[in-house]
């Protein structure tokens, strides 16, 4: 795990969950965060490789980093305003 992932302020384990559950959990978690805080998402659903980046773009959050070469996938997002 690179430093960006290890320094996340919040962590969400979505392993074993299938679409649409991971994105629903991300949305719920992000709502409880302050603007600028970071969230590490760990998932193994292949749909997250498309859904998490789309969620960030649609909701004006920043996808700081992602590792999707193999499972578990990791995503680091920063909450927007």
UniProtKB/Swiss-Prot annotation:
GO terms for molecular function: sulfur carrier activity. Pfam families: TusA. HAMAP family: Thiourid_synth_A. Keywords: Cytoplasm. Signal peptide: none annotated. The active site is at 19 (cysteine persulfide intermediate). GO terms for cellular component: cytoplasm. One of its GO terms (biological process) is tRNA wobble position uridine thiolation. Sulfur carrier protein which probably makes part of a sulfur-relay system. It comes from Shewanella sp. (strain W3-18-1). The keyword 4Fe-4S does not apply. It is found in: Cytoplasm. Belongs to the sulfur carrier protein TusA family. Its main location: cytoplasm. InterPro entries: Sulphur_carrier_TusA, TusA-like, TusA-like_sf. This is Sulfur carrier protein TusA. PROSITE patterns: UPF0033 (PS01148).
């Amino acid at each position: 795990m690179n430093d960006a992932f290890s320094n996340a302020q919040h962590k969400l384990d979505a392993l074993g969950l299938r679409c649409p559950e991971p994105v629903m959990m991300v949305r719920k978690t992000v709502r409880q965060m302050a603007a600028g805080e970071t969230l590490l998402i760990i998932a193994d659903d292949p749909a997250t490789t498309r859904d998490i980046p789309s969620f960030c773009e649609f909701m004006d959050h920043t996808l700081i980093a992602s590792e999707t070469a193999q499972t578990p996938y990791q995503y680091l997002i920063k909450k927007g305003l």
